[in-house]
Amino acid sequence: MKIVTAIDSFKGSMTSMEAGLAVTEGVHRVDSDVDVQIRPLADGGEGTVEALVAGMNGMKQEIQVTGPLGTPVVCEYGIIESSKTAVIEMAGAAGITLVPDEKKNPLYTTTYGVGEVIKDAIGKGCRRFIIGIGGSATNDGGIGMLQALGFGFMNKNGQPVPFGARGLEELETITDTYVIPELKECEFRIACDVTNTLCGEQGASAVYGPQKGATPSMIMQMDKWLAYYAALAKEKFPKANAKQAGTGAAGGLGFAFLTFTNAVLESGIKIVLEETQLEEYIKDADLVVTGEGRLDRQTAMGKAPIGVAKLAKKYGKPVIAFAGSVERDARECNEHGIDAFFPILRGITTLEEAMKNENAKRNLADTAEQVYRLWR
């Protein structure tokens, strides 16, 4: 008997690997001979570094970088030595969670730290990059990241523009004279599940600006500045296309990657499933187990568990899912490859208690045990 687990993290509660271990514990209470293969899962957002480092035999790295407010933060990323691949979550260097509510202001927040992480990984020999760009605090069009990599963004006096979206207002010239030479050898797979363009009603500023602290007047200004930046970039880099889907991701970071580096934007779950080679594990499995913290209609619209389920159904494998909470509309998941799903809560409790790491792991193990007794 072979069971493959590929469970997304229960955010704020347990990691993907912890969830897999909990299921293993529950199954082995019934039959210790069952071969349970734990494959970490993520969707390109939070938990991607954790999942890919575990799934690809990587090592975690820590580096102090310039945070979104211009002050130092410690960012964790992963290196897969065998393939010289770095796994980075931009939110670790420029994420919204690093900015207190009272300091949210995209005119000043920068992606400079993201570039510093990339530069550090290049210095350690990496030439492949997997980067999740969700959860940003920024709207600087990625110029901060590019500045850290050696690109010049100059004002009319030939001086570097300041950090943040306000730097775009002063922008007159873009140079690549001092770009680190190894950058041209690098390939970037960017985990991006939004289709917003750089500018306009569905652009970076209009759609995501408010949650980053932008006022209506700021949104109008930043949209205008980003449009000018895109036009200026196109003069030097003809492939620049501000209307391409995903260029508005992470405050224009998607545009920066596509224009200034050798990058492709891809579905986060697609990247994770391919990089962890989950398909090879599923081919001869008897059962596939997936899940996430909350199962609902949004899950059915293409979140990580559905990616797993679709892969499993390619080989006719049964799929069950576990979740911390299950909404009534989660039944739509049954139409997308999940044969049955189960909440793991054992009784009435507070959210705080339910999300405690030890409680969550115990509840998942107990539920997995009972479900396996029925399934075997």
Predicted regions and their residues:
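N-terminal loops that bind phosphate or other acidic moieties
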Residues: 1-133, 137-376
